[in-house]
Amino acid sequence: MSMRSDIGNWRRFYSETFGVSFSIDKIKIPKARPGFPRIIIVGPGLTPDRIYDACAARFPCVRHYMNLDRDVAQDEREAQRAYAVLVRGGEESDPELAAMSAESLRERKINAITLCEYLLYQLKHFTETRTLLDRKHVTMCAGSRYRDGRVPTAISHRGELKLHWCAPDEENPRLRAREVIAQI
């Protein structure tokens, strides 16, 4: 799929999923990089709870923190205006980032997916395939932090998306991040 047709798909996705439209043409698209074929477009003003609710309307979801809008206190990228990131696009998070803590990623200046970006990617993937991402490994959304400093995590287990958390210094072979290419 070409980047142009993928952008058109995002336009339809936003219209059908959230009933909104905005000028996608003015969004800065990160420069293409080998291995990062998928684009995630984050619409302006979208909140974690709004995206989570759209997910929960389509497939089973559970979460540890009940008010994501309040409890997600920090994002590396904010959706005040629309923006785009590129991801590798696999069904599982990046194997080369296995067992790396959120702190290690930050020290190495690796941009990681935020919770909003992840939820949008999960929702878009589900609308395209009727399957959920991350059925074998836990994705660490290291571009975000809960207000208590913990890092949001996600896994799909038995057809249900589960949002939980890990410590910022936690290293575990089943815990992986998704690197993003951003140009904000």
Where in this protein do the model-derived segments appear?
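A binding-site-centric feature that preferentially detects glycan-recognition modules on secreted/surface proteins
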Residues: 1-111, 115-184
